[in-house]
Amino acid sequence: MSHIFAENGEKAMRRILMIVFLALAGHLLNGQQLPGIELIMRLEGVDSPEDLDSYEVERLESLLDRPLRINHASLSKLKETGLLSHYQAVSLIDYRSRHGDVLSYSELSAVDGFGADFVERIAPFISFESGSLPGMVASDLGTSHEIAVKAASKTVIGSLETDPAAFSYALKYTLSDAGPFAAGIAFANSYDGRGLKPETVCGHIRYDLKRARGKIVAGDFNARFGQGLALWNGMSVGSLATPSAFLKRSSGVSASSSFSGAYALRGVAADVTFGRIRFAPLIAFRHERKSASLLPAANVSYFGRHGQCGITHYAEFSMTSERTSIPDMKTSADFAVCLHGTDMFAECAYDWASGSSAALAGAVFPVAEDMRMAAMIRFYPPGYSPNRSAAARSTTKCTNEHSVSLSGEAALGGWLDLNGKEGFGSSVRRATCTFSLDAACFPETKEGEDPRDIQLKANTEWTVMLTKAFRLKSKASERIRTWGQPFRTEIRTDLTYMSDPWIATVRLDAVCSEGFGFLSYLEGGYKTSKMAFYMRQGVFLVDNWDDRIYSYERDAPGSFSVPAYYGRGVWTALTGSWRFARWGRMYARAGLLTYPFMQKKKPGKAELKLQFIFYI
């Protein structure tokens, strides 16, 4: 009897949600805006949200909510956001000291090291807030505090077993703009956690050095140098779908206080600049029950007017009760220069433990006024250790790969003025096209007895503004390889209606590999500066795991979700946020996933999330 009531309740809930959804989708007005995830995609140079990393999304979502105040930020703050390279940050500081605060996008585009295209990509993440007269430098705004609290509950439905609901929580506190000091700490417990004791703790204390133009960080931090071939902790975008993804902008040493803290190093690090030379020493440690590790590292970089070069070295000491060893040690040299609009970069690294060398080199260059391309070659021998490496790659690790990549993007047609927009960024090209090709040879076979394996990937995407409100995006990709399933073809189309304050999207996605997979959803939403509400209703028919389809799901900041849909089912998701005061915002998400079309019964799940962020 309880099972019957559960099914009736589920149907009633879906009926109510669909009524709300259709009511929202029927009230489209005029105007236009881009969703936050698309702004992040454009900055990172990816063509789909499924290619993004959760840590990067969390970091950039916080900047969308509270943009970087470039007229108040120190050199350390400008660099650690990852928006600007070291040269751009130094150039901006120098411009502010000579000419005063930057007050417009056009003025920022004229600063040495910037440009209109780059400023357009970072525009949503920065603020020109200034309390000074033109030509003067902004003063400090005072201390700010940010507190984020979130809780979630998940339960299995439609199962004969009575499993208790799983519970997770997270808490984060950030102190900033407190003179030279900044600090942050985060606690988190996942669904698999036992009790209320946090599974992960991540925090830092940062002190800015004014005379040396640098900082000291104690606690959890990130160390990212060169193009990521030797030392780049944390995940990075491996996809090379657009030219913007080829060249990495290393942030050096930066503090970390993410909810997960999974990728951060823990220890003490410094980042100081003397003239054109930056020196970044660090030491990180990790302690477990029966072993411990120590990681000393250093980077020295020189920054010129047209580029930079640097040397990075680290060694990992592994210590047990029996012996001490050095399982991982690398040295690398890198450079990046920009000449006449062409970016050229390279990095080579030597793995002392295996005695193997790895290298990459590439360029991003204009072909015509409205077209640019990028090319890269990579040589990663099988013996090269992928530990702490996050360079561009064709698979998941920077090892056992000889590859070449090519990508291009072009703008077609005239300019289209967007409704409700004025000034910088108020118009877009009617059509844009991107393509990418990637060919890789793996010296050590992945499977079988062949001496080597080969993989080819091709991708193209078209974005067309049909009107001032309707946008059509079509993407086609093909992967061919000599192991596993030899072919994987995917075709995806998104039709979006963006009309302030409303938005609606229809997605159709088909995959052909082992069999055939299909996914589609209809989403409607409402967004203003004070509140936002989205509802998504989707269906998927995927009988084979190799045909699985990934789909980005909206969530609260710090909760990036890209589930793989497999089976035959439907899902409904409600996501909303409300700025109830100048100092606070609430986020909520409710999701329901069931499998009514499966021949063999499969339990679904229901999930509820709630998150508060307070600004003091």
Language-model regions, residue ranges each:
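Outer membrane beta-barrel
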Residues: 194-251, 255-281, 370-386, 528, ...
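Amphipathic, charged-and-aliphatic alpha-helical interface segments
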Residues: 54-103, 117, 122-126
